[in-house]
Amino acid sequence: MRNRQLTLSFPSTLYLSPVLELLLADVPAQLVPLVRLGLQEALVNAAKHGNNLDPAKAVRVHYRGGADWWCWVIEDQGAGCPECTCLHQGPEDSWESGRGLYILHQVFDQVEWCQQRQRLQLTKRLAEVDSCP
């Protein structure tokens, strides 16, 4: 498969099924449930925590993908994410909504947050499968 790009913008909502279907179109079937979980967490965070579910505020997703890698950049119009300084804490930590950030780190190979632009970049690579002789 050659590299593909897609940009989506949608009003803040928790109805994400159509958006997720478009964003997962190039992901291999065996990875779809896991990546869907991660993308759903990220999109819910952007719409709910970033944009306060304000339908006048948009969530924008830039997608790039190749044969064995996928990258999603999610932007919201909110004020930022103060708890994002603690991205590596686990779900047992006491701060609210930290579970979603923990899930992102379990699902994606790379998670980068840009506070100044309210932008989250998620990268997933297809793990090489060792073949038996």
Please describe what each predicted stretch is.
Residues 1-37:
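Bergerat-fold GHKL ATPase/HATPase_c domain
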Residues 1-5, 47-133:
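Conserved beta-strand-loop-beta-strand hairpin that lines the nucleotide-binding pocket
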Residues 27, 31-35, 39, 67-69, ...:
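Hydrophobic alpha-helical segments and their boundary regions
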Residues 30-55:
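Conserved ATP-binding N-box helix of the HATPase_c
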